[in-house]
């Protein structure tokens, strides 16, 4: 059995991690994509319009992009084929239904705790010291916690690694991370807080070179994105899928909750709660006055996410969907990508080349419609209607 866990494009290569016969593999592939151009002969390949096309390989990925750039605007000359080269690579190498072993996929749930000397930590400056990092292995259930102060550990399923300071914490964490090499990391609000803060703070303390050790390929990228009118920071760690369990929960449970705080979701779904620390006036008082309880608080957070997955199986669903569509795990959040991959593979099996992608002006904006949030509940005499209007010229 051979299956991938992540495929990442870097220049002209596809960087692939996965498992073969139970053992981890890691490969760098020089990839030569296949495109299709109109043909006058019966080549065995057609378009959706029933026109003959023939396959060509202009060269590596960079040459294919240059070929697109050069000929896409030529009138009457259409270039067919999948231009997402990761999807094309996966389809080329996994043409049959993908068989996979969930027990081999290394899934971590992760949570961090940070100083709050100046209020809630900010991922854009990462000015506050990292105090704790906890990780739970989903398959073994073992928890490893890195902390900067002594802790009285009384649990056999927890390994507490006491660190001299923050620099020592990051160094020991990186050693563990490289040795264990997770395939998929999850957590609650992980994508917009825990991972960006680890990356930002580590870069500030250890430098960019050391931070790149987070990726098995040495590639860590950060970008700003806008969500609900707010600018957020998002990190990409090449070779590792970062799946926010909060986003999974919102997308695949099909329920509306009055709050999406982990404490509320854990209570609703599991009948469990985060560790209460209301006896302290501030979060700073919490970690300065009762370190042992503070560590337990951090550990419980990774356990709650792990138990949510045990019950809901949303990561399992995500993995199944990705392999069915032949995509990366993170692509399940993007409906267009998923349908692109599904359609491409369906047509490929029938020797039909996917049509060329229409080039649009991304700067052109269109007025959007107001979307009213529905009120969940049972209703009688429901009507479904659609209204449209056209501006009078």
Write out the residue ranges for each language-model feature.
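Non-catalytic nucleic-acid-binding interfaces of large nucleic-acid enzymes and RNP effectors
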Residues: 1-83, 204-236, 276-277, 294, ...
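Conserved RNase H-like, two-metal-ion catalytic cores of nucleic-acid enzymes
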Residues: 3-9, 14-46, 86, 93-184
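Short active-site loop/helix that positions an aromatic residue
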Residues: 194-204, 388-392
């Amino acid at each position: 059995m051979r299956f991938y866990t992540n495929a990442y494009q870097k220049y002209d290569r596809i960087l692939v991690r996965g498992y073969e016969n139970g053992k981890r593999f890691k490969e760098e592939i020089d990839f030569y994509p296949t495109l299709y151009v109109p043909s006058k002969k019966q080549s065995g390949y057609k378009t959706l319009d029933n026109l003959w096309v023939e396959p060509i390989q202009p060269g590596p990925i960079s040459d294919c992009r240059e070929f697109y750039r050069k000929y896409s605007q030529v009138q009457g000359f259409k270039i067919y084929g999948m231009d997402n080269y990761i999807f094309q690579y996966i389809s080329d190498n996994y043409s049959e239904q993908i068989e996979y072993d969930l027990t081999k996929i290394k899934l971590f749930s992760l949570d961090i705790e940070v100083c709050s000397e100046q209020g809630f930590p900010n991922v854009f400056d990462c000015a506050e010291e990292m105090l704790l990092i906890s990780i739970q292995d989903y398959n073994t259930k073992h928890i490893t916690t890195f902390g900067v102060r002594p802790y009285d550990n009384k649990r056999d399923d927890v390994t507490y690694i006491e660190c001299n300071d923050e620099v020592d914490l990051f160094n020991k964490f990186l050693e563990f991370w490289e040795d264990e090499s997770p395939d998929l990391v999850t957590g609650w609000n992980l994508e917009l807080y825990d991972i960006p803060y680890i990356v930002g703070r580590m870069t500030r303390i250890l430098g960019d070179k050391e931070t790149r050790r987070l990726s098995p390929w040495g590639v860590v990228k950060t970008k700003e994105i806008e969500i609900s009118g707010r600018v957020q920071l998002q990190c990409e760690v090449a070779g590792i899928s970062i799946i926010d369990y909060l986003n999974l929960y919102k997308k695949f449970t099909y329920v509306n909750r009055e709050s999406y705080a982990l404490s509320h979701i854990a209570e609703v779904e599991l009948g469990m709660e985060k560790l209460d620390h209301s006896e302290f006036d501030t979060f700073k008082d919490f970690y300065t006055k009762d370190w042992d309880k503070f560590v337990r608080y951090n550990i419980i957070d990774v356990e709650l996410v792990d138990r949510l997955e045990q019950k809901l199986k949303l990561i399992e669903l995500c993995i199944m969907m990705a392999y069915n569509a032949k995509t990366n795990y993170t692509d399940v959040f993007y409906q267009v990508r998923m349908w692109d991959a599904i359609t491409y593979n369906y047509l490929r099996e029938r020797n039909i080349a996917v049509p060329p992608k229409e080039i649009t002006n991304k700067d052109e904006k269109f007025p959007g419609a107001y979307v009213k949030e529905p009120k969940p509940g049972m209703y009688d005499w429901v009507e479904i209607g659609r209204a449209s209007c056209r501006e009078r010229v």
